[in-house]
Amino acid sequence: MGPLWFCCLPLALLPLLAAVEETLMDSTTATAELGWMVHPPSGWEEVSGYDENMNTIRTYQVCNVFESSQNNWLRTKYIRRRGAHRIHVEMKFSVRDCSSIPNVPGSCKETFNLYYYESDFDSATKTFPNWMENPWMKVDTIAADESFSQVDLGGRVMKINTEVRSFGPVSKNGFYLAFQDYGGCMSLIAVRVFYRKCPRVIQNGAVFQETLSGAESTSLVAARGTCISNAEEVDVPIKLYCNGDGEWLVPIGRCMCRPGYESVENGTVCRGCPSGTFKASQGDEGCVHCPINSRTTSEGATNCVCRNGYYRADADPVDMPCTTIPSAPQAVISSVNETSLMLEWTPPRDSGGREDLVYNIICKSCGSGRGACTRCGDNVQFAPRQLGLTEPRIYISDLLAHTQYTFEIQAVNGVTDQSPFSPQFASVNITTNQAAPSAVSIMHQVSRTVDSITLSWSQPDQPNGVILDYELQYYEKNLSELNSTAVKSPTNTVTVQNLKAGTIYVFQVRARTVAGYGRYSGKMYFQTMTEAEYQTSVQEKLPLIIGSSAAGLVFLIAVVVIIIVCNRRRGFERADSEYTDKLQHYTSGHSTYRGPPPGLGVRLFVMTPGMKIYIDPFTYEDPNEAVREFAKEIDISCVKIEQVIGAGEFGEVCSGHLKLPGKREIFVAIKTLKSGYTEKQRRDFLSEASIMGQFDHPNVIHLEGVVTKSSPVMIITEFMENGSLDSFLRQNDGQFTVIQLVGMLRGIAAGMKYLADMNYVHRDLAARNILVNSNLVCKVSDFGLSRFLEDDTSDPTYTSALGGKIPIRWTAPEAIQYRKFTSASDVWSYGIVMWEVMSYGERPYWDMTNQDVINAIEQDYRLPPPMDCPNALHQLMLDCWQKDRNHRPKFGQIVNTLDKMIRNPNSLKAMAPLSSGVNLPLLDRTIPDYTSFNTVDEWLDAIKMSQYKESFASAGFTTFDIVSQMTVEDILRVGVTLAGHQKKILNSIQVMRAQMNQIQSVEV
């Protein structure tokens, strides 16, 4: 059973190292008499003897076996315990076999007793402590394993017994030992008193100092270890337990060598990794050699540094070899098909030693081949994608016809971003062929009768050559497309005759070049008039015809009179009576009739062939009639309000859903009229719906309908996900290309052209009143709001002027001074909107007061170009800001100009200089003088980059001298990742540097 128990003992309980014994008293070291106390004197006797090595020692012996009732005591001198809790006593003795003694009485013994007595000082006397078991504490009865006889004595054979006993706990400063004989014949040869402790040891990477054993034989004393040099604890705090026999047991926790150090000398030393090796993590494993293309520069390395020209990606493990960028792709093959292209190539000769090779395609348009190439626009399509291609092929479409392109095929891998060099690439030059035009994007109804419809459409976005003609296909909605009829037109306007009255027709149009027909446009639905509608229209036009004739006659007479007056008063300036005109006049190249139709109040009619004319709802005697005529009434049960997204002049603005019977549910914006309104407020609120309901254009906000028959009164419009243009631009500062910004401006101009063609004057055109949807389509909104602003409004944007509030910063000078609002004054406002867009929502005229703005405009000062604004766009702004309104461009001309810029992106490459060569002086607030600021924080506030204050400060860029030396790498390091923000800060730093040089030259 014993051997089996030993084999099954848990390894954790096996002793780690032999105990250390500290001797408190050893009788064998005495060179003179021991002088121990005996009682009675006739008992124990001190004599000199020899040990097993024949060394002279002092011993005690007793042999009173022939006398009965023996009680012989032997007491040691006072022994100090020196902090020990458990005492061990080793006794060497010999005992005479009682049976070998002739005639010995039965009281003969072969054992003796061991006692101890504790005391804080040496207090024993001849009589104290009493010679009895109490107060003495008995340790054990000691019996001999071997005893000697008369024969042994004759042969001088010594049979010495060695016994060890322990006792504890002891707590006083010292103790005495006593040996009691009660009738034996024995010799106490040697007594050694000692205690045990666990030795100093290095175990599990930690040093454990000497530790005293516990008071009991089963005690475990916990000892806290200290990690060896360059090691750290893992898991739980490291401990060892010292048992009662002075042996270490039960190790808990461990220390392991830190990264950069390995365990040597049986785990007792953590040595730094030699040069050329490294260790990345904590543990017992050894250092390993550096991966390929890497090295270390010192001992104790945790990773190996890549050699020049080699890199390690952020996600690469430290034991991965350093790699490099790939070489260029090879054997590029291109296949052009009209305006599409297939590119194929073979992988690079050298992948850089990596497997994450991908390809990027850089497209550059070189026009006719002369001049610098520019990046392709967003219209070019790449399949499967432009960046991160895993296969060596790509299909590119929607290229411009007759255009030279350069395509760079970049080979990149996981370390390309780490390299300071540009990716290696293979380039190919191609020229596209002639191609059919793209689809027509939008079609408008110009006019209609009972049997005809006149339609107009815009030129395709990509004509790809000269448009020869258009083909219009149409058919009744309730019939199949197989029943369609085609009509050709050399222009973008056509009148379709011989249609059925009151019938809905489906129309599609496509353009043709020498390369053939393009795709048909999307289906558009238009309806002819019913007979009843036609009769009503004729009756309404009769007064207009009469009025037009009369107006024509008056016009001829006026021309004659003017000629006579001019001839008589040549050289004198004629007073301009326009400024006394307080009404909004709608003028065009056709006659105007201002007489009221029967049953209605005064309305303004302007006739332009094929174009709807805006009717002012305030000319109705009953404005509610205008709401009924132009706005669709919606049942409140179809509207679901979800959340409030803002507040307007008349109430809250909410988002929600509209579900009309038979139609899909759509997301809408809902304006509500606050409770407690007056009748005038209700009329003014609904007037905007009466205005919006007359408009139908992709760049004008669309009215879904109104709710007037229940409370609250609502205006429901399409929902624009990105909100107002000014805040949208500020939130996305620097995120769009110039072409994208011009596209936004083109949409706004197209919407304003539509409104101007209808003879509607907006009066409050500003970026805050332009809404943007999820596709970045901009739409004009907020109709008639400025018309109803009261004098007590608190909005600082609007300032009192001549009977109302005017947004000074956006308003033309004649409108400010004389309240003269026309489409020409809207053009001035459009120029300000252009400036807002190109500056990403910056406030026009910055922090100038409204009066300062008025004074500056009167002195012919104009806004300077925003940062990175093309010269062509700033020149168009200046054209819009001509003082003479007759010299400003029409919205149609603006649309054509922007279309040309979009078709020819090279025209947008020339940036406007800070001091333009135009005749008008420019306000200079583009980049402030750094000397006007006390701190870098103030400078960042001034250039509207305050979000980077903490980044500049934490990176140490706290003085202008340091900031002026910043590079692109420094700007990236402080966390400026947006390209627009980088340009703005770099431009400001360049000006700061120039200003510093100028100051230094003046000081010299």
Swiss-Prot record:
Name the organs or tissues of expression. Wide tissue distribution throughout development and sustained expression in adult brain. The longer form (CEK5+) is specifically expressed in the central nervous system.
The record lists the membrane-crossing segments as: 545-565
Q: Hey, which stretches end up on the Cytoplasmic side?
A: 566-1004
Domain of life, per the record? Eukaryota
* GO CC annotations, alphabetized: axon; dendrite; plasma membrane
Top class in the EC scheme = transferase
Q: Which ranges carry the Fibronectin type-III domain?
A: 325-435, 436-531
Tell me the PROSITE patterns matching this sequence.
EGF_2, EPH_LBD, FN3, PROTEIN_KINASE_ATP, PROTEIN_KINASE_DOM, PROTEIN_KINASE_TYR, RECEPTOR_TYR_KIN_V_1, RECEPTOR_TYR_KIN_V_2
Q: Which stretches make up the Protein kinase domain?
A: 639-902
Bilayer topology term:
Single-pass type I membrane protein
Q: Name one GO molecular function term.
A: ATP binding
**Catalytic reactions on record:** L-tyrosyl-[protein] + ATP = O-phospho-L-tyrosyl-[protein] + ADP + H(+)
Is the Ribosomal protein keyword given for this protein?
no
Where ATP binds, per the record, is at: I645, G646, A647, G648, E649, F650, G651, E652, V653, K671
Q: What does this protein do?
A: Receptor tyrosine kinase which binds promiscuously transmembrane ephrin-B family ligands residing on adjacent cells, leading to contact-dependent bidirectional signaling into neighboring cells. The signaling pathway downstream of the receptor is referred to as forward signaling while the signaling pathway downstream of the ephrin ligand is referred to as reverse signaling. Functions in axon guidance during development. In addition to axon guidance, also regulates dendritic spines development and maturation and stimulates the formation of excitatory synapses.
Which family does the record assign? Belongs to the protein kinase superfamily. Tyr protein kinase family. Ephrin receptor subfamily.
Please state what the protein is called.
Answer: Ephrin type-B receptor 2
Organism source for this protein?
Answer: Gallus gallus
Classification from the root reads: Eukaryota, Metazoa, Chordata, Craniata, Vertebrata
Q: Give the gene name.
A: EPHB2
